[in-house]
Design a protein with these regions (language model features):
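Short amphipathic alpha-helix segments
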Residues: 127-137
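RNA-binding basic/glycine-rich loop and surface signature characteristic of RAMP-family CRISPR effectors
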Residues: 1-126, 139-220
Length: 220
């Protein structure tokens, strides 16, 4: 089994939706834990990386660099929508020093109630966006929607476990991570730009070298 660390840096405000609102104040809220610290669910990032891996395969095959196939993606990630994957498992992605930070915030919420609350903590990581639906150049009546988004600049990290020790599987995961440029909702409106990578410089370099070597070989 191979253990890797996946990192994501938010290059723009990002909407990792929980599927719920927040009372009558927010129509679409982000995912956060019991003390107000945001995170990226494992299942969400698995789906994004699976789609990114398929895109990598498609682009390489289009360039006649036939190193990976859709079957490789299925073997690594399992069938789309399945709860458990074939060869890979993800942890939720949390901020750095998550457990220590959570313990501090839990203490402050309990002992400094006048200054700290779950709301104040989640507000420190987020901001509010409002938008309306436009119809024929005019704001549509009753279309105002409010959503909470994660602030640009937050970084997340989590463990990735790959059952296969095959170098090609590790290379495809590394390439899929580097290829992933946006996550979350409202990506066509400028949200969700990210930098995603496996925190292993050697693996990333080997993956790129593997592509370049085979590209040169295919050109000869």
């Amino acid at each position: 089994m191979t253990q890797l660390k996946l990192k994501i840096e938010l290059l723009s405000d990002t909407m990792i939706g929980s599927g719920d609102g927040y009372g009558a104040v927010i129509d679409s809220d982000v995912v956060y834990d019991e003390v107000g610290i945001p995170f990226i669910p494992a299942r969400r990032i698995k789906g994004c990386l699976r789609d990114s891996a398929l895109q990598v395969v498609e682009r390489l095959n289009f360039a006649n660099i036939n190193l990976f196939s859709e079957d490789d993606v299925k073997n690594i990630f399992g069938k789309k929508g399945a709860k458990f994957s074939a060869d890979i498992r993800f942890d939720n992605l949390f901020i750095s020093d998550y457990e220590k930070t959570k313990a501090v915030f839990s203490y402050l919420i309990k002992n400094k109630k006048d200054d700290f609350s779950i709301d104040s903590i989640i507000n420190s990581f987020t901001n509010i966006r409002r938008n309306t639906e436009i119809e024929k150049g005019i704001a549509k009546e009753h279309s105002l929607r409010t959503m909470r988004v994660l602030n640009k600049g937050i970084s997340f990290e989590g463990e990735v476990a790959i059952d296969s020790s095959n170098d090609n599987s590790n290379f495809l995961i590394a390439l899929a991570a580097m290829n992933l440029k946006r996550i979350g909702s409202k990506r066509t409106r400028g949200l969700g730009e990210i930098k995603c990578y496996i925190d292993d410089t050697s693996l990333n370099k080997k993956a790129i070298d593997f592509i370049e070597l085979n590209a040169k070989g295919g050109a000869n």
